[in-house]
């Protein structure tokens, strides 16, 4: 599954392999997922807040999603409703990121891409400077690096025999 699309709207079809009597999967078939669950963390709320600010909303309205993935309980319910034996859980990894602007560098890998794509190079530079200042307050660096809590959601399902 991709964390760039709303999961739970199309997720039941994805898990259809677990529905009793559905072809071509066999009883005992497994389905597993892991997705980032950090869309309510400061790295993302600060990005959305800045994008929604008076300075940026004209260019960035609708660019960032608020509900990118579901919660572990939602995935569990969908899998159980599909006739699977299932389990779901979450873990928060404390990533130690090296370097200056470590969290900004991290979110450039995926979360910040839609913003940067919607802006001119000069606008992107200004946005990143404002965003970086906010991130520095939320994620202060230490002599060891910058601690970045990264929540992941996991779920597994097995088609009932």
Where are these regions (language model features)?
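Residues within well-ordered alpha helices
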Residues: 25-27, 50, 54, 78, ...
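A short glycine-rich, Lys/Arg-flanked "PGG" loop and its adjoining helix->strand segment in the class I
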Residues: 15-30
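Generic recognition of short, well-ordered alpha-helical segments
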Residues: 15-19, 45, 98, 102
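Conserved Class I S-adenosyl-L-methionine
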Residues: 63-161
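Conserved class I S-adenosyl-L-methionine
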Residues: 30-57
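Loop/helix-junction capping segments adjacent to catalytic residues or to phosphate/diphosphate-binding pockets
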Residues: 11, 40-42, 69, 97
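A short SAM/SAH-binding and catalytic strip from SAM-dependent methyltransferases
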Residues: 1-15, 37
């Amino acid at each position: 599954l991709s964390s760039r699309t709303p999961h739970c709207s199309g997720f039941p079809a994805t898990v259809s392999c677990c529905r009793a009597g559905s072809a071509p999967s066999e009883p005992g078939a497994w389905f597993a997922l892991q997705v980032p669950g950090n869309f309510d963390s400061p790295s993302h709320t600060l990005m959305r807040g800045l994008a929604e600010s008076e300075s940026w909303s004209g260019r960035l309205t609708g660019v960032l999603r608020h509900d990118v993935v579901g919660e572990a309980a939602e995935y569990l319910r969908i899998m159980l409703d599909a006739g699977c034996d299932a389990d779901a859980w979450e873990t928060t990894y404390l990533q130690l990121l090296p370097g200056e602007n470590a969290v900004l560098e991290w979110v450039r890998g995926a979360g910040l891409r839609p913003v940067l794509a919607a802006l001119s190079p000069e606008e992107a530079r200004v946005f990143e400077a404002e965003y970086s200042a906010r991130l520095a307050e939320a994620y202060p660096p230490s002599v060891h690096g910058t601690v970045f809590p990264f929540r992941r959601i996991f779920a597994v399902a097995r088609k009932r025999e």
